[in-house]
């Protein structure tokens, strides 16, 4: 199925060819709940490969899922090879490959965006769009043309959009199309976040109900970090020059180490417990690694296999991070990697998503760091019984 790459934007040397750029065909603007255009940037080859009858509906049995994991996923595998070994659910494979194609195009559009006084823009067909809106449209198109997504919503379009896929054997997807879009002009790393839930529900569910989550990281390297419910670990794929996603790392444990990323520091003004926590990091000579982008700040915990990210609220610094679009998917990635997440009292994967725009504070990191986070903010930790707080450099 990697052959569908030809229908997307060929990466590497081909992407730098003016002729290739001119030949690129995009659809009209994505129009939720309206008639869809006859063509897409995916082209007819992807349309042909994603016919609704391509894969049988229905969830795999637990026995089949376990059997699929007997074949070890290997470093060096392509995305398709990895997914074929990681899950027997062909619908989920198709959805993740389509999202990978969209993120490859987003990476190119971010890299070539024109940044003026108010926004960074690039072309989408005949339109000039802010790059976050362009990413939003590309991801909605990817989900529509996967033919296995029932509902989708995004941080830019926080209402359920019917993608036309089945309920039984299909999925609902929530995504942040371009987290950190305000720092594109400064050339900082930005990214895409998405979570995949089975069926047609995105409320009344928890982050723990996800069957997969992923993030795309658009920085010096373009990477695609994926975790699946029935596959151990969190897995990183690198976008090669020829446009292929290659499996380059798996993470199954997050150890102790003195690295911190403190978000929403203005909350330390009137949240003395958060101020105490940040001062502890400084006093203990933790290494500060904070970019202002949630995706790279969380991704470094998975890559370095240590550290903590915090984003805490206060009476005057309210919660901004969205549970559905950002917090739960990233929590899934961290916990599948062997780390922990917390809203101060519980794992973010245990929080019921009551409304699409629900917001929360959060911390991600190693077990001991989450214990320290919970104990400092609330006096006790649900994790403390089985671990001793302490970090090593």
From Swiss-Prot:
Annotated residues that bind Mg(2+) 3 are located at 176, 179, 326
> Which Gene Ontology cellular-component terms appear in the entry?
chloroplast; cytoplasm
Write down a Pfam family by its short name. Answer: FBPase_C
Keyword entries, A-Z = Calvin cycle, Carbohydrate metabolism, Chloroplast, Disulfide bond, Hydrolase, Magnesium, Metal-binding, Plastid, Transit peptide
Protein family according to the UniProt entry: Belongs to the FBPase class 1 family.
* Superkingdom assignment: Eukaryota
Which residues bind substrate per the record? 179-182, 290, 320
Kindly list the positions annotated as binding Mg(2+) 1. Answer: 126, 155
* Compartment(s) where it occurs, according to its Swiss-Prot or TrEMBL record: Plastid, Chloroplast
Protein name from the UniProt record: Sedoheptulose-1,7-bisphosphatase, chloroplastic
Q: Which reaction does it catalyse?
A: D-sedoheptulose 1,7-bisphosphate + H2O = D-sedoheptulose 7-phosphate + phosphate
Give the cofactor binding note. Binds 3 Mg(2+) ions per subunit.
Q: Which GO terms describe its molecular function?
A: fructose 1,6-bisphosphate 1-phosphatase activity; metal ion binding; sedoheptulose-bisphosphatase activity
Please report any disulfide bonds recorded for this protein chain, giving both cysteine positions. Answer: 115-120
Give the originating organism: Triticum aestivum (Wheat)
Q: Pathway membership of this protein? A: Carbohydrate biosynthesis; Calvin cycle
Q: Which cofactor is essential here?
A: Mg(2+)
Quaternary form?
Homodimer.
| Induction section of the entry | Light activation through pH changes, Mg(2+) levels and also by light-modulated reduction of essential disulfide groups via the ferredoxin-thioredoxin f system. In etiolated seedlings, induction occurs only after 4 hours of illumination.
């Amino acid at each position: 199925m990697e052959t569908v790459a030809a229908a997307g934007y060929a990466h590497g040397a081909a992407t730098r060819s003016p002729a290739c750029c001119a030949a690129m065909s995009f659809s009209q603007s994505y129009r939720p709940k309206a008639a869809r255009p006859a063509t897409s940037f995916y082209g007819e080859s992807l349309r042909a490969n994603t016919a609704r009858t391509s894969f049988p509906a229905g969830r795999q049995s637990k026995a089949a899922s376990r059997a699929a994991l007997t074949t070890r996923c290997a470093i060096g595998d392509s995305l398709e090879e990895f997914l074929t070994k990681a899950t027997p659910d062909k619908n989920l494979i198709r959805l993740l490959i389509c999202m990978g194609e969209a993120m490859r195009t987003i990476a190119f559009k971010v890299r070539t965006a024109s940044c003026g006084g108010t926004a960074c823009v690039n072309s989408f067909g005949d339109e000039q769009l802010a790059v976050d809106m362009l990413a939003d449209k590309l991801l909605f198109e990817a989900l529509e043309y996967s033919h296995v997504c029932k509902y989708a919503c995004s941080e830019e379009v926080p209402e359920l959009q019917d993608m036309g896929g089945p309920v039984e054997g299909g999925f609902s997807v929530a995504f942040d199309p371009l987290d950190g879009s305000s720092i594109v002009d400064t050339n900082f790393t930005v990214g895409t976040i998405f979570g995949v839930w089975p069926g047609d529900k995105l409320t009344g569910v928890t982050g723990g109900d996800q069957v997969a989550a992923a993030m795309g990281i658009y920085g010096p390297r373009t990477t695609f970090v994926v975790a699946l419910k029935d596959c151990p670990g969190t897995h990183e794929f690198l976008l090669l020059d020829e446009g292929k996603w290659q499996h380059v790392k798996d993470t199954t444990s997050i150890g102790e180490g003195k690295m911190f990323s403190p978000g929403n520091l203005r909350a330390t003004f009137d949240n003395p417990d958060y101020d105490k926590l940040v001062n502890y990091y400084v006093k203990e000579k933790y290494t500060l690694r904070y970019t202002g982008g949630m995706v790279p700040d969380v991704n470094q915990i998975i890559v370095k296999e240590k550290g903590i990210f915090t984003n805490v609220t206060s009476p005057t610094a309210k919660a901004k991070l969205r549970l559905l679009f950002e917090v739960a998917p990233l929590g899934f990635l961290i916990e599948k990697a062997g780390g922990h997440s917390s809203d101060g009292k519980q794992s973010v994967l245990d929080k019921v998503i009551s409304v699409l725009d629900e917001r929360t504070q959060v911390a991600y990191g190693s077990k001991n760091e989450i214990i320290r986070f919970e104990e400092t903010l609330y006096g006790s930790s649900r994790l403390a019984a089985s671990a001793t707080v302490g970090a090593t450099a």
